[in-house]
Amino acid sequence: MSAPTRRPAPDAPGAAGIAPAPPAPAAKPAAGKPKRIGPEQVTGAQSVIRSLEELGVEVIFGIPGGAVLPVYDPLFDSKKLRHVLVRHEQGAGHAASGYAHATGKVGVCMATSGPGATNLVTALADAQMDSIPVVAVTGQVGRTLIGTDAFQEADISGITMPITKHNFLVVRQRNPAVLAEAFHIAASGRPARCSVDIPKDVLQGQCTFSWPPRIHLPGYKPTTKPHSRQIRERAKLIAAARKPVLYVGGGVIRGEASEQLRELAELTGIPVVTTLMARGAFPDSHRQHLGMPGMHGTVAAVAALQRSDLLIALGTRFDDRVTGKLDTFAPEAKVIHADIDPAEIGKNRHADVPIVGDVKAVIAELVEILRHDGAPGNLDIADWWAYLDDVQSTYPLSYGPQSDGSLGPEYVIEKLGQIAGPDALYVAGVGHDQMWAAQFISYEKPRTWLNSGGQGTMGFAIPAAMGAKMGRPEAEVWAIDGDGCFQMTNQELATCAVEGIPIKVALINNGNLGMVRQWQTLFYEERYSQTDLGHPLAPHPDFVKLAEALGCVGLRCEREEDVVDVINAARAINDRPVVIAFIVGADAQVWPMVAAGTSNDEIQAARGIRPLFDDETEGTP
C-alpha cells in the first residue's frame, strides 16, 4: 500500500501526540523598556557589575584571580547576580554554554588574565561552533603592562579572534557600552561567543555610569527578514518536487522555530530529518520524522537525503558528518538553503535558492505562500513515502545483546529516556555515549538535548549539565557521559555539591575510549593503541568512591535487571548530585555508521550489513 501524500498528526493522546513545548525566552537581554540610571561616579569594576545586572544576567560562572579581582569585590554586594565558583575555567565556559542552550538566554563566564583566560579557550571554540550565545568577561594586566610579558599576561583578544564572533579589549572607560554591545552581538543574528577583556587599571579607575548606554555598531546589521522573491522561488520548487526532504539543523532551535517547522511539515507532508544539533526541534514520535542523518544516523534519514530531489535546508550548515563525501551527497537534489548567517549559504553545497534571514520568519512566510497558492494539496509524494517507509521498516534503529553477556549501554540509555521522559534535559559527553543518547532517547521538545556537536569536546557534559540545571532548576537534568569524558571535568561535581545543584550522571563505564577503540577495531586491525583506561570491573578510579568524595551519591549497576531500580533510586535523590556507574562491556559499538570520508551510499546498518538503496542490486560496488 502506498503512503498518503502527507501523514496526519496522531489524534489520540500519548507520546505521539505531545505538543511542542512553548518557546524558551529569546537569546537577548532582559525585555521591556529600560529604566534610566545615572549618571553617577563609580569604579570601572562597579560599572561591570551594574551593567550585568541591567542586562538581566542571573548567574555568572567563574573563578577570581589577580587581574579580575576588582570585579569580584562589588560582586560581593550584588543582590541580583549569583556567582558559581567552578573548579576550572573550562568548566565555567561549558556551564555558561549549558545555561544558554537550555534557556535561550546569554550565558556569562568570568576569568582572570593569562592562564585563567586561556583555560576558557576550548569552551569558547565549542560554543562558537555550535552557535551558543555566551559572553566571556576576563581581566587583563594594566594598560601600561600590555606587551611587556607581564605576570599572567596573555593576548586573549588575539588568541580568541578566530573563535569568537567579536571580542573587545577595553582600553578606555566604556564598560557599560562594551558589555551591552557584546550581549547584542552574541544574541542577535547567528548566536555565538563574544569576549570582553578589561585591563586591571580600567577596572580600578573611576568612570561615569549611566544606563542604558549608547550602542554604536555601525558595521553590524544582521539580516533577519528574508526576501519575498526567494521565498516564492522556494515555494515553486516545493510544489514541483517528488522526493523532498526537510533537512533541519540547530538553527531551528536557536531561532525558536519549532512550532513553525511542525506547521510546515504537517501542511506539506514532507519527511523531516533532524541533525545532531537539532534533536528535539521536531518530535521524534511524529509520523513524518525519519530520525537523525549522518555518520551515525538512521538508514532512513540517510537514504532520504541521498535519494531526494529537493533538500529544504533550514538552519543547517551541511557539515561533513552529515554529507559524508561531499561530491556524492544527494547527487540529484536541488537545494533550498535558509540560514541567518550568509557565510553558510553555499559554503559547502551550492544553493539553487539561497535565503538569508531568520529561520522562523522564513518558515512562516513560506507557509503563508503555500497556503495562499494551494500547493500542499498538490504534492505528489506517495511513492516517495512508500519507499521511505520500506527503508525505515527494514532498517530500524536496533541493538542486540553484548557478546560477552555484559550490560548493554544502548539498553541503559534507552531505559533512562523512557523513565525520565521527554521533559527531562539530557546533556551528553562526546563519543559512544553521545551517539547512543542521540539515537535511543526520544526527544519531543526543543532545548531538551545538549551536546558538543561541532567541536566534539570531551569534558562537556558535567559542567554543561550544571549550567543547564542553573537555568532550568525545575527540570530533571541528566549528564550522559563516558568514563573518558567524565575524567576530564568531573571536578565540577564538587561545584554542584557545594552550590546545591543536583544534577544526575549516567556514567557509561566501559574502561576505554570507546569511539576511538571502535575506529581501531574497524580501520586499524584491532591494534588498540592507548585507548584502555583500565578494566571496568576494577576501575581506577573507583567512580562510586570518587563521586562520594566529591560530595555526591555514588551508585553502581552491572546487571540489566537492576537498571530500572537504580535509575529510579537516582531520581528520588534531589538534595545533591548523583552518579550511577553503569559497568558495560568494552566492545559495544555504534551503528549505523558511514565511515569518515566515504559516501553516504556506503552506510552500514550494522557491521558488515550494507543496505541496498532503490537503484542498486546485489553485487553493486
Swiss-Prot record:
One annotated GO molecular function: thiamine pyrophosphate binding
Pathway: Amino-acid biosynthesis; L-isoleucine biosynthesis; L-isoleucine from 2-oxobutanoate: step 1/4; Amino-acid biosynthesis; L-valine biosynthesis; L-valine from pyruvate: step 1/4
The protein's Enzyme Commission number: 2.2.1.6
Biased composition, class Low complexity, residue ranges: 1-19
Cofactor(s) needed by this chain: Mg(2+); thiamine diphosphate
Region of interest: Disordered: 1-39
GO cellular component, one term: acetolactate synthase complex
Residues binding FAD: 190, 296-317, 339-358
Keywords for the protein's UniProt record, in alphabetical order: Amino-acid biosynthesis, Branched-chain amino acid biosynthesis, FAD, Flavoprotein, Magnesium, Metal-binding, Thiamine pyrophosphate, Transferase
GO BP, sorted A to Z: isoleucine biosynthetic process; L-valine biosynthetic process
Chain residues that bind Mg(2+): 483, 510
Gene3D superfamilies, sorted: 3.40.50.970, TPP-binding domain (3.40.50.1220)
SUPFAM superfamilies: DHS-like NAD/FAD-binding domain, Thiamin diphosphate-binding fold (THDP-binding)
Record protein name field: Acetolactate synthase
